[in-house]
Amino acid sequence: MDRPKPQTVRELADTLCIPLVDILLPCRFCNRFLAYIELVAFDLKGLQLIWTEEDFVFACCSSCAYATAQYEFSKFYEQSVSGRELEEIEHKPIGEIPIRCKFCLKKLDLLEKLDTCYRHQQFHKVRRNWKGLCRHCGSIG
């Protein structure tokens, strides 16, 4: 029986029994190898590795994540709502709703979601998924 394929960079490093710093992962979009800081950021963002049928594995570099997020927002934007409206639409509390950063694609934690509500900022539906603003992108934007 086949073992499940690793979904994170850390799982891949553990499966291969090599240090994370020695992992060489190409970006699926630009084919550049991710730098160590990008490997760590990939896992912190809650992204998953991309596996091909031939068992090649890819990730997404920070530059391509930003470009993808921008492209999707410009082409697949659906609507913007407040936090309370989002809870009404999804019939769930904000903490249970998956929301990614509209710039870097990081999965927002509860504090980032609540901060968006506190600041009366909007959440955006893009390609059937919710987007907000993470603390890092919010601090530089």
Swiss-Prot record:
Function, as annotated: Plays a major role in the induction and maintenance of cellular transformation. E6 associates with host UBE3A/E6-AP ubiquitin-protein ligase and modulates its activity. Protects host keratinocytes from apoptosis by mediating the degradation of host BAK1. May also inhibit host immune response.
Pfam families for this protein: E6
Subunit structure: Forms homodimers. Interacts with ubiquitin-protein ligase UBE3A/E6-AP; this interaction stimulates UBE3A ubiquitin activity. Interacts with host BAK1.
Keywords recorded for this protein, A-Z: Activator, DNA-binding, Early protein, Host cytoplasm, Host nucleus, Host-virus interaction, Inhibition of host innate immune response by virus, Metal-binding, Modulation of host cell apoptosis by virus, Transcription, Transcription regulation, Viral immunoevasion, Zinc, Zinc-finger
Gene Ontology CC entries for this record: host cell cytoplasm; host cell nucleus
Subcellular location: Host cytoplasm; Host nucleus
Database matches in InterPro entries: E6 (IPR001334), E6_sf (IPR038575)
Matches recorded under SUPFAM superfamilies: E6 C-terminal domain-like
Principal subcellular localization: host cell
GO biological process: DNA-templated transcription; regulation of DNA-templated transcription; symbiont-mediated perturbation of host apoptosis; symbiont-mediated perturbation of host ubiquitin-like protein modification; symbiont-mediated suppression of host innate immune response; symbiont-mediated suppression of host type I interferon-mediated signaling pathway
Molecular function via GO: DNA binding; zinc ion binding
Protein name: Protein E6
Similarity-based family: Belongs to the papillomaviridae E6 protein family.
Annotated zinc fingers (unnamed), start-end: 27-64, 101-137
